[in-house]
């Protein structure tokens, strides 16, 4: 089997471990281990009798339900999709129409794949690896375009400045050619969280800014740095959200986009009808109202992430990064592909190598935060092979 570029490939892992896929403990996909919520299962069961009917092509009830998460919005500002991946495809189609689109790297591999599918010109802005005390961290630099290089007209040597993030460190240059920016927040795979004040000024500099907030739900509301409350102020802002990670529904494929209604109407003309099946729509409508599950998740994550971080930091040759999300990036003194293979063979545990991130390579791996019992099993498995 070909080595997967995504997490969650249990068939590949089981073949390597020599066991059934059901026996694999999966730390490679960053999915909430507390779900799916009972509300989702009940909603799906209630719709089984309606499988002989097409979904509402406008998904009005689903959009209205999503507005409960974002009360400042009306349904025409929201577009459900077949996972956030489908919606990112249409975002990349728009970005490809610009002169160049920048990715904050290391970046989720699907961003570059989707941009290349539409023959986009891609630039990269790397996060800088720094060590503070004994903790490694990625320090974002100011997302400011080097305008001096542009005056020389050399697109190949155009770069971003490397000053430390400062939202007031630049002024927009209206003479710049149309540029796009695609990033995620919290950042995957580092788990770093960008403040709103870092991203908002970029909306004056870039023609289109797409922010993938797939993991933002894992932060309690008072800690989130979502730009959804500001989307009505910026017609060039697109926010993409996932419902499958927080609610543990990756098999249903469900996400949504928040953007100007004119943009969303254009996207609807590009895509196939009925991208969200009737069971997924019912589950989504139910889970966004499930405040008990949301509170349970926020209570679980803080303690479980701390347990896993401290446990990894205590193991020889491993250096975890602080994270705001439900996963941890770990720097390893041993090749991560070897650790991955040994963990599967000895403990039937799957971790996510970072070979699909060229900036990271074989000295990093990523692990999801799971229950404290599962986390301890991972720590014991790593201790056995290190």
What are these regions (language model features)?
Residues 38, 335-342, 374-377:
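Short, conserved charged micro-motifs
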Residues 1-85, 90:
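N-terminal small-domain helix-loop-helix segment of the aminotransferase-like
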Residues 37, 58, 236-314, 319-321:
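PLP-dependent aminotransferase class I/II
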Residues 302, 312-347:
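Conserved PLP-binding catalytic core of the aspartate aminotransferase-like
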Residues 94-115, 121:
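Conserved PLP-anchoring active-site segment centered on the Schiff-base-forming lysine
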Residues 123-144, 159-221:
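Active-site phosphate-binding strand-loop segment of PLP-dependent enzymes
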Residues 345-346, 356-386:
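PLP-dependent enzyme catalytic core of the Aspartate aminotransferase-like
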